[in-house]
Amino acid sequence: SIRSLPLQPDGEARWRLPAGEYWGQFRIEESLMLRCEAGAVINAEGEGNALTIAAPNVTVQGCTLTNWGSNLTKLNAAVFIQREASHAKVQANRMQGPASGIWVDGTSNVSLLDNVIEGELRLRSQDRGNGIHLYAVHGARVIGNRVRHARDGIYIDTSNGNSLEGNQLEDLRYGIHYMFSNDNRVIGNLTRRTRTGYALMQSRKLTVIGNRSEQDQNYGILMNYITYSTLRDNLVTEVRDGGAGEGMISGSEGKALFIYNSLFNRIEHNRFERSALGIHLTAGSEDNLISDNAFINNRQQVKYVASRRQEWSVAGRGNYWSDYLGWDRNNDGLGEVAYEPNDNVDRLLWRYPQVRLLMNSPGIEVLRWAQRAFPIIKSPGVQDSYPLMQPPAIAPHPQENPS
């Protein structure tokens, strides 16, 4: 029990843990606030959970937690929040260890604020726990945390009505990973050097606004079976080709945005830049509204694999394409000629990459001319009828200069 520690009273139901190293695993079974002094360290001796919260209305603040157990099957964590521990607050703690940093199990209205979580580099990525793991959780606030070298930064499973804001997630498998979770808000987060920045899967009604993905591999934002969701004011830059890797959908070659079997989403005012591929849309992804985005200096702007034509403009406004070669005669900010990023020649290049060696040859130019002159041979693809002549501004990110 937490009562075995030399706690000092700090007010009604408030306790202070003096500086020092304390060995063992501890449970909190009553509503209280635990505040650790600088230099107070709880070392779990490589076993179980460092702290288990098993009562409602508990606050844990300012503690350093280390060396908890590495058994992922037993859900070992630095802080394990049980079902009965609603309204828990875990704030401004530091955690370094092998399994999950904070595991929240089937409770509601928890607040995880400003924690620093560091995984165990000596372990393979798949053998580490997640920085923060929510399972069957409702009403959680996950704000201002920093996670490095865990498996996934924040993993949300079967959890509805939660908010993830202003978290910084670096050197991970997935930065933010959603599975079977609805009505969640993902606002102003930063991922960097992950193998997928935002892995959004099998969920609906996600609000994904003002996030950044920098130097991630494989995917910046991956949407897999996502419906009725909004992506707005996100910046994805420098997504690199890291190979397929573990758990990746085939064909993960540096895609800023990958949309797989996702419908009825609104994707607007985002910027996808300097990546191997700007946007890849496939597998029945239809009825999405895609407008006012900027696709800037991607090696390939669009890959679209489907049998139906898609229009990527809304109410007379399309997207900005840095490789658009049209003109604006009436100065209304819109190109006079539609942007068609993937014609039959592009499809040929996708199927036979070696043909790229002939990209600027007279033969390729003849093929493109024939396609324009005889549109009857034109395959279904993407068309932006109102391409923008200038990239739209996106809202500033709260972590423009993260430390």
What are these regions (language model features)?
Residues 1-27:
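Acidic Gly/Asp/Thr-rich repetitive segments characteristic of extracellular carbohydrate-active
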Residues 29-32, 56-57, 86, 107-110, ...:
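Short "repeat-start/strand-capping" segments in structured domains, especially the N-termini
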Residues 20-21, 39-40, 324-327:
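Acidic glycine-/aspartate-rich tracts in secreted/extracellular proteins
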